[in-house]
Amino acid sequence: MVKPEKFIPKAIEKISQEIKEGKAIIALSGGVDSSVCAELAYRAIGDRLQPIYIDTGLMRKGETERIKHIFSHMNLHVVYAKDRFLEALAGVTDPEEKRKAVGETFIRVFEDEAKRIAADYLIQGTIYPDRIESEGGIKSHHNVGGLPSVMDFEKIVEPIEDLYKDEVREVAWALQLPEEICERMPFPGPGLAVRILGEVTEEKLEVVREANFIVEEELLERFCPWQTFAAVLGKGTGVKGDIRAYGWIVAVRAVGSRDGMTAEALELPWEVLKHLEARITSEIPKVARVVYDITPKPPATIEFE
C-alpha cells in the first residue's frame, strides 16, 4: 500500500525534474485520478500548469457545470468539443476502434490547446490497472493504448502510473481534496461512448445519459457501490399501452471492488431492481426493457466495452 506522506513529496519532486521549464497542460476530468495529478503538478510547477477540461459530449448529466464549479479556483479552461468527438465516432462500432477514436480526438484537441498556450508537456492520470489491461490486450485505455502513435508533446508525464485506485484515493485525502473528489466513482475516459454498444448516436447518448443519472441517484448513497451505471445494449420489442414498441434495452451494472482488478455484482434487493426498471421505462419512453448484469470480473470487465 502507498504511504501518502512519502509518495506526495517524491511525486512532486519527480514532476519538477521532468518539467524543469516550459508549460504543461493536464486533462482535468474531475475524477480522482486527474484531480490528484493536477494538485501534485500545481504544487510542483505552479502557474506553469494549465488545467483543461474537455466537454466531449460524452459526459454524464450535469458533469461539465459541476466540474467548472469545483475547479474554478484553478483557472480551469473548458473546451467544448462535442462535434469533433461525434464526428470521429460516426460509423464506428468496434469497441477498440471507438476507444482509439476517442483517444486520438482527445489528444488532438489537447494539442490544439497546447499550441495555443505554447505547452510542451501533457500530464495524465494513468493508473496501474490501466497499464495492466492495455499491456495485456484486455482493452486499450484512452490515455494508454488508445493514444495515437504521433503526438506533438515533448513528453507525457504520468505521476500516478504505479498506483491502484484505492491508493489514489488515499493520496487525494492526504492532499486535502474535497470529499466529492476523493470518493468519486470511476468514470471511463471515453465516457458514455463505451456504455453504448455499437455506433454512438445522439439518440443513444440521450438515453444512456438519463439512465445513468437515474441509476446513480437510486444506488450511490444507499448501496455505496464501487461503480454503478447504465448501458444501452441495442433494441428490443416492448409494449406501450396496447401497441408494440421497438425500444432500447438498458442494462444496469452495480459492482463492489477494492481496486478494479476484480469485481462482484451487488446483490440488490428485488424491490430496488423493480423500482429502477419502473423509473427508467417511465422517465425514458424510448426504453423498452431493463436488465441487471450479474457477471463478475473476471470473466467480464466492469464496463461493457
Swiss-Prot record:
Coiled coil: none annotated. It catalyses: XMP + L-glutamine + ATP + H2O = GMP + L-glutamate + AMP + diphosphate + 2 H(+). GO terms for cellular component: cytosol. GO terms for biological process: GMP biosynthetic process. Keywords: ATP-binding, GMP biosynthesis, Ligase, Nucleotide-binding, Purine biosynthesis. Disulfide bonds: none annotated. GO terms for molecular function: ATP binding; GMP synthase activity. ATP binds at residues 29-35. Its EC number is 6.3.5.2. Residues 2-184 form the GMPS ATP-PPase domain. Pathway: Purine metabolism; GMP biosynthesis; GMP from XMP (L-Gln route): step 1/1. Catalyzes the synthesis of GMP from XMP. Heterodimer composed of a glutamine amidotransferase subunit (A) and a GMP-binding subunit (B). PANTHER family: GMP SYNTHASE [GLUTAMINE-HYDROLYZING], GMP SYNTHASE-RELATED. This is GMP synthase [glutamine-hydrolyzing] subunit B. The gene is guaAB.
